[in-house]
Amino acid sequence: MLVLSRKINQSIVIGDNIEIMLVDIRGDQIKLGINAPKNVKIFRKEVYEEIESQNLEASKEATADKLNILSNFVKNKFGKKQ
């Protein structure tokens, strides 16, 4: 893990198009500003972990019967790939 020190209004750059700026410090909390392209998904870690958990649970609910129904629908709707 890379650890950097920054002061308020200083930033770091990731790649060519992501900038993370330290906006404010109050007590034990900091505020970050993130400039990134709209196609880059940005989540707080606890939100991301919840999304992963829900996706995992949803995938467990996809039974073989449901997958077969979906497969048949796609084949009938779009035809088999040549």
Curated annotation (Swiss-Prot):
Q: Which UniProt keywords apply?
A: Bacterial flagellum biogenesis, Cytoplasm, Repressor, RNA-binding, Translation regulation
InterPro entries in UniProt:
CsrA, CsrA_sf
Ribonucleoprotein keyword on record: no
Q: Which GO terms describe its molecular function?
A: mRNA 5'-UTR binding
Q: Does the keyword Transferase apply?
A: no
Xref: NCBIfam families: csrA (TIGR00202), PRK01712.1 (NF002469)
Q: What is this protein called?
A: Translational regulator CsrA
Q: What is the lineage of its organism?
A: Bacteria, Pseudomonadati, Spirochaetota, Spirochaetia, Brachyspirales
